[in-house]
Amino acid sequence: MFRKIAAAVSAAILSVSLASCSMTEKSVTEVVNNTEVPPKMLFLGDSIAAGYGLEGYTADDNYHCRSYSNILREKYNEELRGKCGHTMVNKAVSGATSSDLIGQIQSGQLDSDLADCDAIVVSIGGNDLLGIMLDLFNSMGISESGSFNKDNFDFFSAASMFLSINSDVDKALDQFELNIKTIAEELDGRTEGTVYIQTLYDPLEYYSKFKRVTDFSDEKIGRLNEIITENSACGYKVIDIAADFEGKAGSLTNIADLDIHPNAKGHEVIAEDVDAAFRATGFTYTTTVYGDRQLSAEGRIVIGGIIAAIAFLAVVGAALLLRKKKDN
């Protein structure tokens, strides 16, 4: 009988060694790492974010111009190399208004990018006022080609136009305030990432000789930026681009050519502002760390059974030896 028990134990030990792969496992630990910049960032909004006017920009390609999103992509690819890597997605659409952005978000086409995004940067609002402002430009004798005949400038027509479009601009701003709240709400329901909304710089400050123009744009664009700032409690952080462009429209935009968009230098300034906002926030990413191989739960059960069997074998063996001595 002792030999049978010993054989059974030996067989059990053999089976454990044959099944050693399932008897052991490596411990797995998820480690949260801190980083100053986002592993994945998404840019939304209008032509400013798209990079309109820069060399390499096309209407269907936001990735081959030196826009602020691409400047940061290059920077973060290097900074996060060998760590978690970096991904930049730019879904900005030139000409988009705040209503257009709402439609884009609600369509669901951004859901997959929003779901795993760490930072979402939005540039929106300029086109909400652009059409109205262009009417004003036309009334001043500024053509679509960018020419401006000062000799034929009609001050009275311009003044009349200011009065007539003022209410239109105010209505557009009222709608923008409703839209910015909707944008924040829609994004909040689709992402765990941090949302940032940029303020809008005032390119019309360039026309400093025409105080009525600069006063009007300062008031209306200033109000738009107040709306952005005052509604940040809806769930986003504000990146104050306007502050760093103030007094520099001539050097940071193409307004001298009747193009309100940032030039290459302007995009570098925006990139610095966005980068500073990211670093003030901070982000995390998770890595998996594997420890030394150890017994799995199944292995502990089996080994426990074998130990019990060996102990039982020892007891039986001792009893048999004792009985044998008594028989002798």
Feature-to-residue mapping (PLM):
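Active-site segments of SGNH/GDSL-like serine hydrolases
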Residues: S164, K181-D218
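Structural recognition of the beta-strand scaffold that forms the well-ordered cores
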Residues: K40-G45, A49-G51, T87-A92, D118-S123, ...
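C-terminal membrane-anchoring or membrane-association module
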Residues: F2, A314-N328
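Oxyanion-hole/transition-state-stabilizing segment in secreted/luminal serine hydrolases
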Residues: D100-K171, D202
